[in-house]
Structure formats: structure tokens, C-alpha cells
Amino acid sequence: MVWEKEKIVGSCIVGGAAFAVGASFLHLFLKGELPLGLGLGLSCPWRILRKRKPVRVYMDGCFDMMHYGHCNALRQARALGDQLVVGVVSDEEIIANKGPPVTPLHERMTMVKAVKWVDEVISDAPYAITEDFMKKLFDEYQIDYIIHGDDPCVLPDGTDAYALAKKAGRYKQIKRTEGVSSTDIVGRMLLCVRERSISDTHSRSSLQRQFSHGHSSPKFEDGASSAGTRVSHFLPTSRRIVQFSNGKGPGPDARIIYIDGAFDLFHAGHVEILRRARELGDFLLVGIHNDQTVSAKRGAHRPIMNLHERSLSVLACRYVDEVIIGAPWEVSRDTITTFDISLVVHGTVAESDDFRKEEDNPYSVPISMGIFQVLDSPLDITTSTIIRRIVANHEAYQKRNAKKEASEKKYYEQKSFVSGD
């Protein structure tokens, strides 16, 4: 008699030896209909193998100006369980506890949902874990552990936002990603709009144009603050890139879609155009221009984030399969052949209209080959949009950053090693 290979559902111990059994065997045994000889001496306790309940972990945050540090935190949190549920704090809660957010809730939701390690998202999460909300997490969302980084999260009254979770024994800690924070990124932009640099010759609209299009930056008066520096403190490692990568290439007959750009201050507009691009094929390859190219095309103040920072932000997006770190400005025939590109795409919303030019068009080769397509951008957001928000409300952000810079300085002075990656 031939027994077909099937899913193992139980185990039995006979004569000191353990046997795994399938559904058909178990069914026949329970009915007493096993073939002659197979049932002899099989009087044993059955242990039905039940599917293990997945470990569900919860992490919340503002996720304002979402960057690769946020993504790395979510990656680490996901590694502590089987399913990651993320709470995104409401605009009202952020204003009450930290000051005005740069990106509204719907944009922050788009960003968090696009992170490849996120399984579920809760909108309008509270800034602090209350008794009621913690009970809701445990009962309704079946959360096993609440996760946060090793940097302190303190409420306006000085108390720990995660005190209740710690007291309940359901709290786990991850390592904060070094070298980046939303405060740091906003600070890089505020470098050009410090109060002392605003004069009759540097109106708000003038500053917006300078920052967005790369004119000479206003000079600081002696003693002016330069805390918000464009210099990144991020130290890239090959291990981090591997952690963010999918680790697999396209199949032999895959339709490969290519899209390129700076992807500076990675935002919801980027996410949505990448989603649209990915829908056109089997594998999405993203070319990320190097810092020199971005500066030459966008102006001296760009990019805000360096090449490695921008690459990690793009790699964390669930719609992206692979990136070219330091892609050429012009899409050449060699690039198309090397990566077996089927279609080159570009969104209608962009920092420049070079893709519409007849001369010096970086996409002239794919256009001539008939493999270039312009996609309607779902959102009218660019990096300049984010910068304009900062400039328009720079006084509020300077005040917010002053508080955060002080707390971050204290964190770095008092921090200790936390295991993890």
C-alpha cells in the first residue's frame, strides 16, 4: 500500500520511538480502520500538533519626516515577533506634546504602510500608552509586547510614556539608529532660515526660493546658531544595506521596471509613484542619483540627505525590489542592457521637467527605444513641498528643535551600549 506525502498533524510514541503521522493515518486509526498489522500494539497517547499563535508586537510613533532610522526601528521591532502592528500618533496629539508636525497624518500613514516590515497600522494612536489603550492593544489587537527604542520618550509632565507597559512586563527595547532623527533632518533645513539670517534682503519667499532652487545661502551673523547642520553623522555599513535588501533578484522572464531620481527627504509622493511603477511589472529597480549629481541639478543646498541615507529609505519601501546606489543621470543603452530593463518610467510631478525636453533629455535613449512611459503622479508632493512647509513655519520648528536638540544631546551623553542591530 502506498501512503501519499501529506501534512503532519500529530505524533505518537511506540516502543520508545517517536513517529509523526499525517491526517489520513490519524483518521483511520481513530475509526479503527487501519490496514491489517498497522494497528497492532498502537495504543498510545496522541498529541495533536496545533499551529503556534503568532507573536504580535506593537510599536508606535509620530513618524514625522519619516526616515531610514524609523524604518530600522520597525525592522528591529518586527524581528522580535511574527507580526508588527504600528500605531501612528494623531496630529492633535503631536501638537499637544511636541509641536506642529511637518507631515499630516494621512501622509504619515502612507509612509508607514509602505514599510516592508509592517503588517498592520493603527491610525490616531495616543502619544502615551494609557490603561485603556493598553487593554485595547492586548485584548482587541492581541498584542504580546510593546516595543520602543532605548532613547527616552518623556511626556510634558516628565513621566515615561511607556511606564505602564514596563510595569505590566510587556515591554521590550530596541537599539536606536545612530546618526539620524527627525530633529536632525529639520535642523539641516533650518540652517538656512535661522532668525538672525532673516532680513530685508532675505524675505520668507526669498528663502524658500533659495533653499528649493539652490541660490547662495544667507550668511549667519557672528554668533548665529549652526546647530542644524547639513553634515550627516550616519556611518553606513554593508551589513545595514544587506538588512534592508530583499536579497533576491528578478526571475528569468521578469518584466523589470526602472525609475530614477534623488528621492531626497523620502515622502508620500515618492511612495505613491513607486507603487504605481511596481504595478507595471514584476520587479522594480530604482536608480538613486549621487550627491554631486543632485547638487548640480537641484542646487547647492541639495541633497538634504546623503546618498546612503536616501538609498536606505528607498530600500525600506515594500514596492522596491532593488536600487542602484549612485545611478547615472542619463539612462544609457548600456544601463538598459545590463539590468535587462523592460520599461523606464517617470512621474508627472517632479522637481524639474527635464524629462519633457527635446534636447539634453536624460531619457532620450529609452524614448528612442520606445520603452519610456510618463506616469500620472498620485500625489502633488515634492521635496520642495516639504522644505516650504519648514520655511513657512520656521519659528515654530526652531522652538521645537531647540527642546529636542537639548534632549538628544543629553541622550548621547548618558547613553550606554544596547545589544541589537
Swiss-Prot record:
Expressed in root tip, lateral root primordia, leaves, shoot apex, stem vascular bundles, pollen and embryos. Residues 403-413 have a biased composition (Basic and acidic residues). Keywords: Lipid biosynthesis, Lipid metabolism, Membrane, Mitochondrion, Mitochondrion outer membrane, Nucleotidyltransferase, Phospholipid biosynthesis, Phospholipid metabolism, Phosphoprotein, Transferase, Transmembrane, Transmembrane helix. GO terms for molecular function: ethanolamine-phosphate cytidylyltransferase activity. Its EC number is 2.7.7.14. Residues 204-215 have a biased composition (Polar residues). The modification Phosphoserine is found at S416. It catalyses: phosphoethanolamine + CTP + H(+) = CDP-ethanolamine + diphosphate. Signal peptide: none annotated. GO terms for cellular component: Golgi apparatus; mitochondrial outer membrane; mitochondrion. Pathway: Phospholipid metabolism; phosphatidylethanolamine biosynthesis; phosphatidylethanolamine from ethanolamine: step 2/3. It is found in: Mitochondrion outer membrane. The keyword Lipid biosynthesis applies. Disruption phenotype: Embryonic lethality when homozygous. The chain crosses the membrane at residues 8-28. CTP binds at residues 262-263, 270-273, 298, 346-349, 377-381. InterPro entries: CCT (IPR041723), Cyt_trans-like (IPR004821), Ect1/PCYT2 (IPR044608), Rossmann-like_a/b/a_fold (IPR014729). It is a single-pass membrane protein. One of its GO terms (biological process) is phosphatidylethanolamine biosynthetic process. Residues 203-227, 402-421 are annotated as: Disordered. Belongs to the cytidylyltransferase family. Plays an important role in the biosynthesis of the phospholipid phosphatidylethanolamine. Catalyzes the formation of CDP-ethanolamine. Essential for early embryonic development. This is Ethanolamine-phosphate cytidylyltransferase. It comes from Arabidopsis thaliana (Mouse-ear cress). The lineage of its organism: Eukaryota, Viridiplantae, Streptophyta, Embryophyta, Tracheophyta. The gene is PECT1.
